[in-house]
Amino acid sequence: MSGVNSDLLHRSTLSVYNNLMDQFNPGLQKLVTLGNSYIKAFQALALTSEAYFSALAKMGEQALSTLSSRSLGDVLIQISETQRKLTAEAEGVFRWFHVEVLQAMDKNVKLDEEYIEGSRRVYELEVRNQAASLERQLRRGAFRDSLESSEYMQYLRQSQHEILKEEERRYRFLAEKHCGLTQSLLYLINKTGVSLQQRADGWKEKVSESRSSRPRTPTPLDQEAQLKSSVGSLLQTGDREMDREPLGRVPSRAPSPLPSRSRSSSVGESLGLGGGRSMRAIVSHPASSNPVLLPFARGDLLTVLIPEPRNGWLYGRHDPSLRQGWFPAAYVASTEDFLPVGLSISHRSHSMNNLLEPTSQSESDTQTYSEVSSPVVSMRRASADVRSVSPLPEKKTESNNELKSGQKVFHEIPAPATQLRRGSADVRSISPLPDRRAESHFESKVELKNYNELPPPAPPLPNSPLPERKTDLTSERPSTQGQPPEHPLFPRGSNPFATVKLRPTVTNDRSAPRIQ
C-alpha cells in the first residue's frame, strides 16, 4: 500500500511540473503578445481620436467668430477638450498596463522556464537517490520503521507541497496584476464620471437655449464691437512680436497669437486664458532622469505659467525649446532685475555699499555661496542702492545675513503635497502606477499611484487604496516531520516569482498643473 502511495505522490508532483512548463508559461507568453497588440490598437485609436477632436475644435473656433453661434462654438471647444483629456487619462492607464503587467509577465516567464526545468531535474535526482537509499536499507534489514515514516515518503510529501505552492503563486500573480488593472479603470471612472455628467448637462442646456432663441440681425453696435475686437487682436499680436525681438532667436515653434491646444494643456489654456510672466535663469538647471523637470542654461528666458510657487517649485516654459516642466523658484529672477553686464559693473564700482564691504567678507561670501547646493533668488535692493543684480552666481555684494537667510530658505523647501483636487473642472491625467520599494513578484498587492504629483527630489509615498499584503515567511515553510534532509528544489534568490527586487519611484510626465 505504501508503494502505491509513493507512486501517486511522485506522479502528482510530476504532473504539476508538466502543467507549469507546458501550459502556464506558454499561456503567459501568449498573453504578453496579445497585450502588446491590445496596446497598439489603443494607440491607433488615440491617434485618430486626437485628429478628430482637433478638427472639431477648429469648427468651434469658426463658430466663435460668428455672431449667431458663439455659445455653440464654446460648447464644441469644451467637448473637444474634454474628450482629449479622457483619451489622455486612458493612455496613462494603458502605460501602467504595459509596464506593470505585460513587461512583468514577459520577464518572469523567460526566467521561469529555466528555473522550473532546473527544479524538476533536482527533484527527479533526489527521488532516485532517496529510493536507492531506502532499497539498500531494506535489503540489509537495517530499516525497522514503517515505510510511511521513512525519509523517502517525507521527501515526496514535502516536494508535492512545495510545487503546489509554486503553482498557486504563479496564478495568484496573474490574478493580482489584472485586479490592479480593474482598480485603475474603476478609479478613472470615479474620478471623471461626476464632472463629466455635470458638463454634459450644461452643454445640453446651452444647445437647447440656442434652439429656443431666434437668430437676430447684427446691429451697427455689434458690427462696431466686432471691428474693435479684430483691431485689438492685431495690435496685441504686434506687441507680442515686439516683445520677442530683444529675447534673441525666435523659436521655430513660437506661440501663435491665436489660442493653441495640446493634449496636455488645460481647458483654461486652450481658451487663451492662461498667461505668464517672463523670467531669466540666474543659474543653469541641468537635465535629469525625471522627465517632468525642465532643464535650461544660465541666462535662458523662461515663461512662468503659474502665479505663485508651489512649495518652492515653479511650472513654466523654456522659450528657446518651448518645453514645459517644473524647476526651482530660486533658479530664476525677473527680467526687470537684469541690466547689461557693463552697466552692472559700472554701478557696482561707484556703489557706496561696495566701498564699505571688506575684501574678506567678499571672499567669505564667495566661499559660502559655493557651499550652497543651489543659488537663492536675488532680493530687491533698497532705493538708495543703485546696483543692479547680475545674472552671474557670484554675488559678492550681498551681506552675510542675506546669504544665510537665502540658504535657509532653499534648504527648507518642503516636499509638495500630493493630494488630488477632485473639483468638477479637474480632469488632469492620472495613472495609478504602483510604487513598490520591496515588492515580491507574486506575494504583494498591486498599489495605485497618481501621476498628478509635483516632482520634488524625494516625494512622499502616496497612500494606496489597496490594503498592504503582509508576507509571512514562516507560514510558507512547510512543517516537516523528522527533519528530512534539506533539498534546493526552489532556492531563494533565484525564483522569478518570489524574489524581492527594489525599483526606483517613477513620476509620470503628466504632472503639469492647471494654469489659471
UniProtKB/Swiss-Prot annotation:
**Subcellular localization, as worded in the UniProt entry:** Cell membrane
Q: Where is the composition biased (Polar residues)?
A: 226-236, 355-376
Q: Where is the IMD domain?
A: 1-227
Has keyword Iron?
no
Q: Which domain of life is it from?
A: Eukaryota
Query: What's this chain's function?
Result: Phosphoinositides-binding protein that induces the formation of planar or gently curved membrane structures.
Keywords on record: Cell membrane, Lipid-binding, Membrane, SH3 domain
Ranges of biased composition (kind: Pro residues):
454-465
Gene Ontology terms, MF aspect: lipid binding
What does the record say about its membrane topology? Peripheral membrane protein
Segments forming domain SH3: 274-337
Q: Where is the composition biased (Low complexity)?
A: 249-270
Q: What is known of its domains?
A: The IMD domain is predicted to have a helical structure. It may induce actin bundling and filopodia formation.
Composition bias (Basic and acidic residues) maps to 201-212, 238-247, 434-450
Give GO terms for biological process: actin crosslink formation; actin filament bundle assembly; plasma membrane organization; positive regulation of actin filament polymerization
**What protein name applies here?**
BAR/IMD domain-containing adapter protein 2-like 2
Q: Name one GO cellular component term.
A: plasma membrane
Map out region (Disordered) in residue numbers. Answer: 200-273, 355-516
* CDD domains per UniProt: I-BAR_IMD_BAIAP2L2, SH3_BAIAP2L2
